[in-house]
Amino acid sequence: MNGTTLNILSQNIDTLWVINCAILVFIMQAGFMCMESGLSRHKNSINVALKNAADFGVSVVMFWLFGFGLMFGTSYKGIIGTDLFFFKTNISEYQTYFVFQAMFVATAATIISGAVAERMKFAGYLIVTIIATAIIYPIIGHWAWSSSYLSKLYADVTTNGSSGWLTEMGFVDFAGSTIVHSVGGWIALAGVLILGPRIGKYSSANKGKFTGSSFPLAILGTLILWFGWFGFNGGSNGAMDETVPLILINTFLAAAFGLLTGLFISYITKKKPDPMYVVLGPLAGLVAITASCNSVDSVSAIIIGIIGCIIAIITSELLEKFEIDDVVGAIPVHLAAGIWGTVAVAIFSDLEILGTGLTRIEQFKVQGIGIIAVGIFSFTISFIVLKILNNFYPLRVSPVHEELGLNIAEHGAVSAEHDLISVLDKQSSSGDLKIRGPQDPFTAGGVIGLYYNKMMDKLETSEEEKNKWRNRISKEIDLAVIVQENFIPKRNLKKYPVKGITFPQEKYLEIFLAFIHTIIVFTL
């Protein structure tokens, strides 16, 4: 087998690896959907799921139209790409890279949905997604990942211009702790500040009422994200080489120790394992290690994961203290842990692997510049645009719709619980005991309806039995009145019904005398 054949085979293996990793990253979308739906209240879970599906479609379309060109097109002074719009090419490496990067832009967008859940309009969220994926993310991506990143992955592909200005400085973010996760976190922060907290979230009367609909679903989503993250970090290498095993083990260890750190902190602070910390811990570890998973050893990855979890939990508590309502903890996990992961590159990475030619202190400064630049651009642009948009088109749903739940208000998605409430309301107003609620052994509302119907069956039977005896007693009383009238025809005893009505005292005497008269007649 000659060198050319080996080279083609190697390229094909690399392409297959990146495609498989892109599929794994796509699966992360399902993980986000499960996690965010599980952490949202039941009345909003369908809305959250639909947003996760819709933002993926919007993200891919925007990336195809504008994003890829802005991010990887010929650079204008390292700030923005100027071509490759309406992406089209016959080069398989470019095609593969487009698919992989399209998964990344969808991830950045879906981070936002969880933070603003339960009160942002569906159409408003799609507008936010367009802004994030067509403008903010691609421009920032160009600064750090532009054509030089592509040429690093595929050395035989012609580059399209100079590198982004952050790349020229030596900024390193291997798989996107800042470029993907912090960008999504900054936009999410702008969104929640403009929207404000959910109605009653920080009222003492509602303490404990804002819990997720299903922690098992949320934890399942966390595990799916963990699984997909192997593709997220592994595919960023761009090739199936000796670096991949290190990337995967660092990814796994950071997440595992993040999880254990979350459990440990929950035992220390709450004396019990908190399911929310089980969600925050591994995800924070994964976000933190994303920037340096190819350039640190396993011990460093463990430290990065542990500190990432601690920072995420502290940030989560600070948000609660300042009444910044982030439904799923997107800001602590993706923004705070992402910043830490980017800083950790300068602290723990092997400088030879980084290949920037900078000292550790110089690398630290460059990483800081990158974090600040990305933060200012992402937050400022998103906050200004959303603030202006909110003045013309309110992004938040009405209080009535928020209380009702976005499943019904925005999608007309009627649940078993809503059907049961409607039945109870109709029954209370009509008094009809024959009305029955919805039954479904696979939903909470349906199970309640099943037992409610059993109770109503017994109540209806009891009511029928009561009516039966009431009618029988009434007939017996009528018969007794007829008998007495035959003995005392001049007296109208129907004026004195014996159906629980109290007679005046003088009437008792008349009835008693009539009774004595009847006995005397029978005796004679």
Labelled PLM ranges:
Residues 455-463:
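Signal-transmission/dimerization alpha-helices at domain junctions
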